[in-house]
Amino acid sequence: MELPGALQLGELAAAFASVPVFPLFDAAYFIVSVLYLKYEPGAVEMSRKSPFASWLCAMLHCFGSYILADLLLGESPIHYFSNNSSVILATAVWYLIFFCPMNLFYKCVSFLPVKLIFVAMKEVVRVRKIAAGVHHAHHQYHHGWFIMMATGWVKGSGVALMSNFEQLLRGVWRPETNEILHMSFPTKASLYGTVLFTLQQTHWLPVSEANLVFFFTMFMIVCKVFMTATHSHASPFAPVEGFICPVFFGSVSSGHTSHHNQHGHSHEASYQPPPPVKSKEELNEGTRKRKAKKAE
């Protein structure tokens, strides 16, 4: 009974991997991506003042992963924009979400049950893009493991890794939102997923690509749908990382504490703390006193 079950599972995975993503899954991907753009502060006002800048930001949200991957592989960063069907579909989604009368389209797609369906469909596209990125890099660099991982990672992370550049287009600069320093769950999951696909592509992971695509897609769908439904930002990897990271990379607090304890006394005698910086109110008070003395 185990062999027929395995055959049925393999056939299911193969059938799932052969399902085309255009236009339905791509449309869902664009809808969720542009929705997240509209959630950004000032995005609606920007769409009224500068529709072209808003459209550029929307295209980055939809095609940022392709731009980064092409840059990594030395190809034209605007190569994907030759796909007229995808660009027109993404443009139509952007226009409907931002400019549909009475916000009807936005209200429909942001309705939570409908949005959860689109979120699940977006994860299907994300995993396909990771697998395609690793496969594309393997075709050019057969033994370049890190190139495969980097290409698959940027294919799955999308505009998250370009968030600071996208913010500049919106006239916002928030360097503390650097995605590499503070990885969100999709970025981190894309990184772990591209490692698995790289191992599979180099025959170190004894599983077919169709099965890996199927199971990793199911994992991403379950996690993202649950996090979206519960409005949670907690990473499912946090418990494992909390156990492994201190073992391999040490504790941040303990390492820095011991370092300061060893060198703190030697610097204490020679180091003179700078005078406290005066606040704006104190500076204004001093200015008023000097003016009063001059008047006297």
UniProtKB/Swiss-Prot annotation:
It catalyses: K(+)(in) = K(+)(out). Residues 256-296 are annotated as: Disordered. Ca(2+) binds at G74. One of its GO terms (cellular component) is nuclear membrane. Keywords: Ion channel, Ion transport, Membrane, Nucleus, Potassium, Potassium channel, Potassium transport, Sarcoplasmic reticulum, Transmembrane, Transmembrane helix, Transport. Signal peptide: none annotated. One of its GO terms (molecular function) is potassium channel activity. Disulfide bonds: none annotated. A 1,2-diacyl-sn-glycero-3-phospho-(1D-myo-inositol-4,5-bisphosphate) binds at K122, R126. It is a multi-pass membrane protein. The chain crosses the membrane at residues 20-37, 52-73, 86-103, 108-126, 145-162, 184-201, 210-230. Changing K129Q: Pore remains closed. InterPro entries: TRIC_channel. Pfam families: TRIC. It is found in: Sarcoplasmic reticulum membrane; Nucleus membrane. Its main location: membrane. Channel activity is activated by a change of voltage within the sarcoplasmic reticulum lumen and blocked by luminal high Ca(2+) levels. Residues 278-287 have a biased composition (Basic and acidic residues). Residues 38-51, 104-107, 163-183, 231-273 are cytoplasmic. Residues 1-19, 74-85, 127-144, 202-209 are lumenal. Homotrimer; conformation seems to be controled by binding to diacylglycerol (DAG). Intracellular monovalent cation channel required for maintenance of rapid intracellular calcium release. Acts as a potassium counter-ion channel that functions in synchronization with calcium release from intracellular stores. Opened by a change of voltage within the sarcoplasmic reticulum lumen. This is Trimeric intracellular cation channel type A. It comes from Gallus gallus. The lineage of its organism: Eukaryota, Metazoa, Chordata, Craniata, Vertebrata.
